[in-house]
């Protein structure tokens, strides 16, 4: 699909796990009049391929550290989309803790929303973005959301979610994720509940599409 813009626009949405990044991304996409001109990418798709790593070790990997992500692949595929070339988007199997063999064929779009905990961490990826957003949500709310998601959607036990949160999620948030807030053009408090911020971002992107 060829868009009308000379160059696609990339908006990066960062924030801690459970902050409301995905909700905001989908709310914006749903509010845009021309749905076929906008796409959403999740940084979660770019976790490293751990196929050769034993399951016991996979379960102990720190998935909230920057090294857990295949940043070169993410950067390369963003560049492909910027040049109006389709990509084969990797998929990640959270139950097996590794990359799936299946990919998703994705055509370029005029607006690319990239959401993930560390999308603002890598300078090269950050430099590809036109708008950088950080979603700032209370720690307790984020933990409850993550707990519900991981147990319902990813088959995790209560103890494993709590242990992971205390062992890696919270420390990595403080060390790597929260500091990327300084790179944001827009800081959104209250996550996906912030209708004013969602409306503002939607209006901005709609005006870009209408040019």
Curated annotation (Swiss-Prot):
InterPro entries reported for this sequence: AAA+_ATPase (IPR003593), P-loop_NTPase (IPR027417), PRK/URK (IPR006083), Uridine_kinase (IPR026008), Uridine_kinase-like (IPR000764)
Highest rank taxon of the organism: Bacteria
Pathway: Pyrimidine metabolism; CTP biosynthesis via salvage pathway; CTP from cytidine: step 1/3; Pyrimidine metabolism; UMP biosynthesis via salvage pathway; UMP from uridine: step 1/1
Endpoints of the signal sequence: none
Enzyme Commission number(s) from the entry: 2.7.1.48
Catalytic activity as recorded in UniProt: uridine + ATP = UMP + ADP + H(+); cytidine + ATP = CMP + ADP + H(+)
Localization per Swiss-Prot or TrEMBL: Cytoplasm
Annotated GO MF terms: ATP binding; ATP hydrolysis activity; cytidine kinase activity; uridine kinase activity
Gene Ontology cellular component annotations, sorted alphabetically: cytoplasm
Alphabetically ordered keywords of this record: ATP-binding, Cytoplasm, Kinase, Nucleotide-binding, Transferase
EC primary class: transferase
Tagged with keyword ATP-binding: yes
GO biological-process terms attached to the record: CTP salvage; UMP salvage
SMART domains with a match to the protein in the record: AAA
Binding site for ATP: 15-22
A Pfam match: PRK
Similarity annotation: Belongs to the uridine kinase family.
PANTHER family reported for this sequence: URIDINE KINASE (PTHR10285)
Name of the featured protein: Uridine kinase
Organism expressing this protein natively: Lactobacillus helveticus (strain DPC 4571)
Encoding gene per record: udk
């Amino acid at each position: 699909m060829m868009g009308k813009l000379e160059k696609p626009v990339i908006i990066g949405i960062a924030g801690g796990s459970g902050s409301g990044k995905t909700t905001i991304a989908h709310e914006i996409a749903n509010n845009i009049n021309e749905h076929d001109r906008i796409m959403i990418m999740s940084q979660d798709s770019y976790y490293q391929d751990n196929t050769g790593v034993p399951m016991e070790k996979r379960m102990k990997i720190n998935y909230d550290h920057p090294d857990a992500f295949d940043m070169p692949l993410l950067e390369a595929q963003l560049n492909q989309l910027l040049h109006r070339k389709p990509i084969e988007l990797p998929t990640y199997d959270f139950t097996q803790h590794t990359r799936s063999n299946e990919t998703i064929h994705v055509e370029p779009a005029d607006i690319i929303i990239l959401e993930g905990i560390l999308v603002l961490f890598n300078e090269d990826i950050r430099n590809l973005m036109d708008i950088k957003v950080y979603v700032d949500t209370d720690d307790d709310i984020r933990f409850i959301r993550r707990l519900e998601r991981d147990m319902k959607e990813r088959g995790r036990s209560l103890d494993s979610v709590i242990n992971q949160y205390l062992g890696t999620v919270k420390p990595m948030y403080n060390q790597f994720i929260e500091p990327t807030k300084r790179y944001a053009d827009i800081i959104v408090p209250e996550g996906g509940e912030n209708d004013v911020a969602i409306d503002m971002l939607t209006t901005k992107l709609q005006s870009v599409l209408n040019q």
